[in-house]
């Protein structure tokens, strides 16, 4: 029995060691900045489609600025501004160690909103990967309207910034879709990063 137990312990130990070797290593840059870039690029494409839709249907595109998914929800303008807040702003918060709410004083027309989002995308693309990864294991303190909430950098991104980012991206997409703009899931997903050949990768969206 002792021999069997030793053998079982050895098998379990080896299995655990193999599992460690298979553990995927995902950096802060990969899980945040690369995701921000992919989704913001996709939303910019949706906004471009919104512009074309308005032109083709003689609609003032600035009417979309105040469009809402539901009367109780905030408009497209807020969704885009907040998208920047929880992406580029999240990186800035990790650097400074503090985060608040989005800037509610910003005002843009449709063109200005596109430019604002495109400029943020450009700045995200210019970030240094090593410098972003070096922000790990820090602290970010949320301070807003009397609420103070401390996070580790990891928890700030995983449980707060990223969920909020995807929520506002989804609402922005849904506002455009519900307003008649011909966008679908492939437009929302955007350009995926794959090891497939360019020819195969180009066919991906027909399955989404």
Q: What are the functions of these language-model segments?
A:
Residues 112, 116-119, 128:
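Mid-length scaffold segments of soluble, non-membrane domains
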């Amino acid at each position: 029995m002792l021999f069997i137990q030793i053998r079982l312990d050895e098998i379990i130990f080896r299995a655990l060691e193999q599992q460690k070797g298979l553990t995927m290593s995902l950096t802060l840059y990969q899980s945040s900045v690369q995701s921000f870039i992919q989704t913001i690029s996709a939303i910019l494409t949706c906004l471009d489609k919104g512009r074309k839709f308005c032109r083709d249907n003689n609609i003032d595109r600035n009417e979309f600025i105040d469009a809402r998914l539901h009367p109780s929800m905030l408009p497209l303008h807020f969704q885009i501004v907040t998208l920047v807040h929880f992406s580029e702003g999240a990186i800035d918060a990790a650097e400074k160690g503090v985060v608040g709410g989005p800037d509610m004083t910003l005002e843009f027309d449709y063109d200005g909103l596109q430019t604002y989002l495109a400029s943020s995308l450009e700045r995200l693309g210019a970030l240094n990967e090593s410098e972003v990864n070096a922000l790990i294991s820090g602290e970010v303190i949320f301070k807003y309207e009397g609420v103070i909430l401390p996070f580790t950098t990891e928890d700030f991104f995983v449980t707060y910034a990223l969920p909020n980012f995807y929520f506002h991206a989804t609402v922005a997409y849904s506002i455009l879709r519900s307003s008649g703009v011909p966008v679908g899931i492939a437009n929302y997903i955007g350009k995926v990063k794959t090891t497939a050949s360019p020819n195969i990768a180009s066919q991906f969206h027909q399955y989404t």
